[in-house]
Design a protein with these regions (language model features):
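Primary recognition of RNase H-like, Mg2+-dependent phosphodiesterase/nuclease domains
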Residues: 1-126
């Protein structure tokens, strides 16, 4: 099973944000990575939600079927693990992630501290 680390960062001075994701095998070797910079600013929760969505889309595109989606936003990971539905804008973004999770045979969610997500975070700054 591979691990998909994802992270999103707001560059408030430039009023843009960056997203990054890294797919690693169970030995920790990088299989694939992807970054993107967008010019519109969003809230931190929106950025993390959109990054998770893009990470799952990317993983599905490259043929991943079993994965652990790991991020450093505890609120985001908790929201994905809970089966709570709401019409709040951020909840709709969480629903997008849940819909994409149906493309996987097995998908687990895991929280890591920022230090554990350093590769994805560093990619954003590149």
């Amino acid at each position: 099973m591979v691990k998909i680390n994802f992270d999103g960062t707001l560059f408030s001075k430039e009023k843009k944000f960056g997203i990054g994701m890294v797919v690693k095998d169970d030995n920790g070797s990088v299989l694939a990575s992807c970054t993107k910079s967008l010019s519109q600013a969003y809230s931190a929760v929106e950025i993390e939600s959109m990054t998770a969505t893009m990470a799952l889309s990317f993983a599905h595109y490259i043929g991943i079927t079993q994965a652990i989606l790991e991020g450093d936003s505890l609120a985001m990971i908790k929201a994905l693990k809970e089966d709570v539905h709401s019409l709040a804008p951020t909840s709709l973004l969480i629903e997008d992630v849940r819909m994409l999770s149906q493309n996987f045979d097995q998908l687990l969610y895991s929280h890591t501290k920022r230090e554990g997500n350093s590769v994805a975070h560093s990619l954003i700054r590149y």
